Structure formats: C-alpha cells, structure tokens
A protein has these predicted regions:
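Short, low-complexity N-terminal leaders and the immediately following helix N-cap/first helix
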Residues: 1-66, 309, 314-342
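Helix-rich terminal scaffold detector
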Residues: 4, 163-289, 293-299, 303
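Flexible glycine/proline-rich
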Residues: 22-27, 134, 258-396
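Short, glycine/charged-enriched hinge/interface segments at domain edges or termini
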Residues: 56-214, 376
Length: 396
C-alpha cells in the first residue's frame, strides 16, 4: 500500500484544476482564489512620509532648531526646510524637502518656537522612503493566492476595485448506507444518524471558494448509486463520498465508479483511513472516504481538503495542511503498527516547548475523540516513539 505522504503527493498532483474565471468587486473577493497575478500600480509608500508624530529637522549638527510650520497627513503643500529649521509633523505626512530626520515627539523639548532634542538624531530615522515596501511594477499578489483580509487590504492600497478570481469549485457530498438516517428522522432498530455528511459539509462551509451541493444519503443499491453519481458528475467539479468504499458485499461505490469512470488509487497505509481512494467520472474528480466517522474526518482534513484547494486554484504548497513540531509527552515502545497512524491528541505548552499527548478514545468510530482533540499526531509505521521525541502534528 502507498504511504500517506506518497498518496498525498499523488492525489494533489492529479487534481484537475478549475480554469473558469470571473471578475468580482473587491468587497466580494474575500476568501476567493486569485486567477491572475496583480501588479503594483505605484510605489509603496507612494512618497516619503513620517513614520510617527514628531518633528522634521534639517541639520543633524544643530543642537536647536527653529520651528516654521506644521505638516499633517493629507497636506498637499510642498514644504521645505532650511538648515537649522524644524517642522511639526504627524504620522503619514509628506516629508518636507531637505529633511534629515524625524525626531519622535517623546524625545523633544519645545520652548516657544525653539526645538531641542533629548537624544542624538540619526540620519533618515523615522522616515518611510518612497518604494521601500514595493516598487511600481512589482508583483503584488500572485495567481493562486487565497484572498484573505491582508490580501484584500494590499489590493485596496494599490487602488484595485475589482479582481479576477477562479469560479467557485462545485463539490457534491454524499454518504452511503441503508443504516443511515438524517437527524430529523425517527431511528428504527439498527439505524444510526448520519454524522459524516453534516461533518463534511461543515468543513467545506469555511471555504468561500467552494460551492457546496448536499447530495444526501445514498442507499446500498448499485443502480441508484450509479445513476446518482452519473448525474452529479455533470454538475460538479468534485464528488466526495463517505462510506461504501471498503471490501464488503454492500460496499457498492467502487463498482459504481468503475462503471462510470475509473479508480486511480485505493487504499493507503494509514490508520484511520485505510480505504481512502480517488478516481474520476469524465472531468469530475471523485474521492472515496471511509465510512467510520473519525477515519472520514482525518482523511478529509489531511487529503480531501488539500486536493479540493488545489483543484480550486491554489498552489500545491499552499494547499498542504498546516503542521508543526511538538515533543511527545508519551512513548510507544515497541511500535508494531504497520501503518502510519494519526492519533488524536491534546497540546500543551511548557518551558521546554510544545508537548502532545494522545487521548484515550482512539477508535475510528469515536467522534468524541476528535471533538476533544487539538491535533493529529503523526506516528510513523513500526517506529518506536520515545518520551521527548519531536513529532509532526496537524492542528484540527
């Protein structure tokens, strides 16, 4: 079986990227993915300006300066200083001609129209120089960038009122199983409420660049599954199916997908989540998630969501799930697990750095363990874990 990281790379490399674009107003672009790099239209800052409230001075060799005027933000006058002169200046105001430095207000003393300084002024201090952040023509935001609040602000600072973004990725979500019922139904004997589909839909709702299609619950009927997936593929860029992808006689998603298209890979050497797979129906990408709730959650967070982000236009490196290092506050000796395991755990910060410890409830059906967990702890297969060893963890 393919290892997790091999599978993740293959899945993302094979993602069918959306090509359709649209232009949206800047105030509606938050959370979308940029489809065309944008270029700085002007230097930033556009002019030399003061970094703080204080006094602009001319003459670093002076011990006192004579005050002549005041420069405020938005003042359009061309102001000039002569040697031995100073000017009251406010943050963001244009720097007067011949200014050597701006002295912060806290380091000055004013008596009448005479300014003195309690510290030695340094050339160019507290002056923001034109173009020190960006030069006109520099790349402001690259194609594939997620338009978060910072990116929106940066685009606005250069006068952009509209941006070209990728159209929303249409994603259909299904669960399968005769035992599943929706939350508004009365449970019969041996039935359970469908938790996977609401969970997956909730994961997707945080992504503005995805248009969610709730496909509902599919029965364990090959004809119905095949017909439903065939229709969904004509209206979706991607399909997510939880359940029905294992090896049982009632696991009918695989044969349905084989009839309609192809299965490109099935099974990864991970726990939970071994039955994870992917394929396609025409141009529509299909991901097969395990039916056990924790396995479905883990594979969707670590594999499904990165694949969808890549398909939606993000760069692969940006789409990869966030991870960092933390010390093991536990040990596994010996570790006989033949698959890479992602334990649900909690994080604590100590004087020795961040530490992680697994929760007690690790069953792939125990969703409460995910609710109480802060991270997924990456445990390599057949590798002993020592107390204090650095491990990779994924926040959830």
């Amino acid at each position: 079986m393919m290892d997790f990281y091999q599978g993740q790379e293959a899945l993302l490399q094979q993602a069918s990227r959306i090509v359709e674009t649209e232009t949206v107003p800047l105030n509606q672009a938050a959370g979308r993915i940029l489809a065309q790099s944008i270029i700085a239209t002007t230097d930033s800052p556009a002019f030399d300006n003061s970094a703080m409230d204080g006094y602009a001075i001319c003459g670093l060799d002076c011990s006192e300066w004579q005050l002549t005027d005041t420069a405020a933000a938005g003042d359009t006058r061309l102001l000039t200083l002569q040697h031995g002169q100073a000017m009251r200046i406010y943050t963001g105001a244009g720097i007067p001609v011949n200014t050597d430095a701006v002295i912060m207000q806290e380091n000055t003393c004013v008596e009448g129209l005479t300014l003195s300084c309690t510290s030695t002024p340094v050339a160019n201090e507290n002056i923001r120089r034109q173009g020190e952040e960006l030069k006109q023509g520099a790349t402001l935001l690259e194609k594939g960038a997620l338009l978060n609040a910072q990116a929106i602000g940066l685009a606005a600072s250069q006068g952009f009122s509209k941006l070209q973004v990728y159209q929303k990725l249409r994603v259909s979500v299904f669960t399968t199983g005769d035992e599943l019922v929706s939350g508004n139904s009365q449970l019969q004997q041996h039935q359970i409420y469908d938790s996977n589909r609401p969970m997956l839909l909730a994961c997707l709702q945080t992504y503005t660049f995805i248009e969610i299609i709730d496909g509902g619950i599919l029965p364990d009927n090959l004809d119905i599954i095949t017909e439903t997936l065939s229709k969904a593929a004509t209206n979706s860029h991607s399909i997510i199916i939880s359940g029905g992808a294992s090896v049982g006689d009632r696991d009918l998603v695989k044969p349905a997908l084989q009839q309609l298209g192809s299965i490109e890979h099935w099974k990864l050497a991970i726990k939970p989540g071994k039955p994870f797979g992917w394929g396609s129906i025409g141009e529509c990408r299909v991901m097969l998630l395990p039916g056990n709730p924790v396995a479905s959650f883990v594979t969707f967070k670590l594999l499904g969501l990165p694949a969808l982000q890549t398909a939606a236009g993000r760069h692969i490196l940006q789409a990869l799930p966030e991870c960092y290092q933390a010390k093991a506050a536990f040990s596994i000796i010996p570790n006989r697990q033949k698959r890479r395991e992602f334990l649900r755990g909690t994080l604590r910060f100590t004087n020795n750095g961040p530490e992680v410890i697994p929760l007690n409830k690790q069953g792939s059906h125990m969703l409460s363990g995910c609710v109480n967990a802060q991270v997924l702890i990456d445990i390599p297969a057949q590798t002993d874990i020592q107390q204090g060893q650095w491990l990779t963890v994924y926040p959830i």
